Amino acid sequence: MNLTALKNMPVSELITLGEKMGLENLARMRKQDIIFAILKQHAKSGEDIFGDGVLEILQDGFGFLRSADSSYLAGPDDIYVSPSQIRRFNLRTGDTIAGKIRPPKEGERYFALLKVNEVNYDKPENARSKILFENLTPLHANSRLRMERGNGSTEDLTARVLDLASPIGRGQRGLIVAPPKAGKTILLQNIAQSIAYNHPDCVLMVLLIDERPEEVTEMQRLVKGEVVASTFDEPASRHVQVAEMVIEKAKRLVEHKKDVIILLDSITRLARAYNTVVPASGKVLTGGVDANALHRPKRFFGAARNVEEGGSLTIIATALVDTGSKMDEVIYEEFKGTGNMELPLSRKIAEKRVFPAIDYNRSGTRKEELLTLPDELQKMWILRKIIHPMSEIDAMEFLLNKLAMTKTNDEFFDMMKRS
């Protein structure tokens, strides 16, 4: 029996399965407790149980395998990993581990890991020779992540505008600057769907911090990738723990030469959470931001890089502006120059209900010549010269009208050449 398979089952099916095994009063229990009871009952028959999860090492030296389904929240179905196993396989927080597990003995509360079968979807022996993330060489993004799907749909227009305004590469550190109600969540959903469609080889993770629960459900249903969330009714310490787990998992995968993409909504709320959690230093900046609070969210955002040894970590984060909060302005100013791609959204365009509400003239990517072919780059620059004199609303309407006449950006450039 596999623990992960049980976690993916709906509660109604779990209750039916438990009742077949002779368990009672399951309807009043939480999902994690039902799984725990089923596995315990299954283990009595002497059959093997397998489980997996993402390792979180605690201060005492031992660790637990947390589940992505519960957004890495501690629960009764977590798997205990002993300090000797952590030392033997040189494990670190964020490692994805799969293996054989055993039920808790007398006086124990958790399942325990017996045998490690896989570390980060690879053989355990291979994990020992990897280079630490901190020792990898960062480079400019030089491999393009195309957003355009080429199906001519209205959703694809957003992706095509993105490709023209600010191309995204593997290892990009991008900032979407968004006022309220400018369509940032829909934009992130579009990016996620484009990545899943065009780049299935990439590991996609969507991290939602301080979001509404219904938006989390919507994202989980729309996105083919891992959606990890901490909703606004959770404490700040929980936001921080979730973010740390996601970034550590991403770093471990990059060490195994994987291309990882994190879409974060939003870095402002994450910085606010760190501001609440960090011990007071006594130095307070404008807006009530502690002087030490922004170091850790900067380390999170700064982890995005293209790696010379293979693999990359891309982070596209949203930053909130015009919220009326001085703290949000300070946080945005701190992150302003750190990214190598910026995509400002405009409230004026959104108020006219023109979507995507991208401010074309202000958006752009550093070193875009590494991501685009010289011929395409030339055409993009000509397009910028045409659009530059227009107001932000006219520019977006003009671009969307012209793009709607064609199915792909190549066709659009051909049409532009002819006219």
Swiss-Prot record:
GO cellular component terms attached to this protein's record: cytosol
NCBIfam families referenced in this protein's UniProt entry, alphabetically: PRK09376.1 (NF006886), rho (TIGR00767)
Domain Rho RNA-BD, residue spans: 48-123
Family listed: Belongs to the Rho family.
Molecular function terms, GO-annotated: ATP binding; ATP hydrolysis activity; ATP-dependent activity, acting on RNA; helicase activity; RNA binding
Protein name: Transcription termination factor Rho
HAMAP family assigned: Rho
Region (RNA-binding 2): 284-288
Subunit structure: Homohexamer. The homohexamer assembles into an open ring structure.
The EC number(s) this enzyme carries: 3.6.4.-
Entry keyword set: ATP-binding, Helicase, Hydrolase, Nucleotide-binding, RNA-binding, Transcription, Transcription regulation, Transcription termination
Stretches for region RNA-binding 1: 61-66, 78-80, 108-110
Source species, domain of life: Bacteria
Organism, as annotated: Buchnera aphidicola subsp. Acyrthosiphon pisum (strain APS)
